[in-house]
């Protein structure tokens, strides 16, 4: 359930829940009444945004999410690493993705040394004191400084075991990564998982590549877009992913995300649920 940040749907009133034990009891009671288990608090945003009007509220939101998770007995908070600005200041994040010239090559390292590592180190230390049972799970996402196993490993080295991975395979497929190989790489650092697919249109990729500035995406023209589980990759791919998660020691939920621009949320969730159930049944039958 989300508390704000980039998410338009704020499922939880963070301030009220932090302030009032009665509000927390009411929330937990309503969840029990509807047989709903709250397994994660989501605070996706950019706490490293160079504009304080954006970065400071997102950083405060993340800490509030960690505090709330501890108060309501939830041990996972999902967010992203964030992305800082460049060396020369400015109010816009700079995503260092491809070292075309020497300046680009050194940018990520500068961001890591001066922004990412200090922030993650301090956040991990604070979390260990304020909410020792909570893991902050970074969704590896292009546009954030932690977007693949190598960049996450650097952040993990600066923080520690209470900063892990939210494994969302949809962000790997369009970048050319194999989610199973990613799972093998990050292994026990996986603290949460999302169920979301990616539909890559090969004919459009041949003409226009994978990088696209259009948002929200137009599924009629985009080279790729997020899709319901099973509509971008088949049952074999999803069964292999579930098996890899279990092999890595992850036995938590796979939280379905709806971001398929072609269908309603209800259709997306129903399709995703059917695919994931088949994948889990195959893995269980083969065990």
PLM region descriptions:
Residues 1-26, 84-88:
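Glycine-rich, proline-tolerant flexible connector loops at the mouths of alpha/beta enzymes
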Residues 2, 40, 78, 137, ...:
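Conserved beta-strand positions in the central sheet of alpha/beta enzyme cores
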Residues 2-7, 45-47, 81-85, 140-144, ...:
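Active-site-proximal loop/turn and secondary-structure-junction residues that shape catalytic pockets
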Residues 7-14, 42-50, 257:
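Glycine-/proline-rich flexible loop or hinge segments
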Residues 11-22, 101-118, 218-233:
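A short acidic, glycine-rich active-site loop
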Residues 12-17, 50-56, 177-179, 265-268:
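Short, solvent-exposed loop/turn segments at secondary-structure boundaries
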Residues 30-33, 47-164, 286:
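Active-site acidic/histidine proton-transfer and metal-coordination neighborhood
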Residues 32, 73-75, 88, 121, ...:
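Histidine-acidic metal/acid-base catalytic patches
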């Amino acid at each position: 359930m989300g508390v704000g940040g980039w998410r338009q749907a704020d499922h939880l009133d963070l301030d009220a829940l932090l302030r009032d034990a009665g509000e927390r009891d009411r929330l937990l009671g309503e969840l029990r009444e509807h047989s709903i288990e709250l397994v994660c608090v989501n605070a996706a945003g950019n706490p490293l945004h160079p504009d304080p009007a954006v970065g400071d509220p997102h950083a405060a939101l993340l800490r509030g999410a960690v505090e709330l998770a501890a108060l309501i007995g939830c041990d996972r908070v999902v967010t992203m690493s964030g992305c800082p600005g460049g060396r020369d200041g400015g109010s816009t994040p700079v995503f260092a993705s491809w070292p075309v010239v020497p300046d680009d090559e050194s940018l990520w390292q500068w961001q890591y040394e001066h922004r990412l590592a200090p922030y993650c180190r301090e956040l991990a230390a604070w979390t260990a004191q304020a909410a020792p049972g909570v893991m902050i799970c970074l969704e590896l996402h292009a546009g954030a400084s932690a977007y693949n196993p190598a960049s996450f490993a650097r952040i993990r080295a600066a923080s520690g075991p209470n900063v892990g991975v939210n494994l969302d395979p949809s962000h790997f497929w369009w970048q050319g990564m194999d989610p199973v190989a990613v799972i093998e790489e990050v292994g026990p650092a996986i603290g949460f998982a999302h169920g979301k697919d990616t539909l890559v249109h090969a004919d459009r990729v041949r003409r226009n590549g994978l990088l696209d500035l259009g948002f929200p995406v137009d599924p009629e023209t985009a080279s790729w877009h997020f899709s319901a589980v099973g509509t971008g990759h088949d049952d074999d791919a999803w069964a292999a992913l579930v098996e890899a998660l279990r092999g890595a020691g992850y036995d938590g939920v796979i939280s379905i995300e709806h971001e398929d621009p072609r269908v309603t949320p209800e259709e997306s969730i129903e399709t995703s649920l059917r695919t994931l159930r088949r994948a889990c049944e195959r893995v269980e039958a083969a065990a």
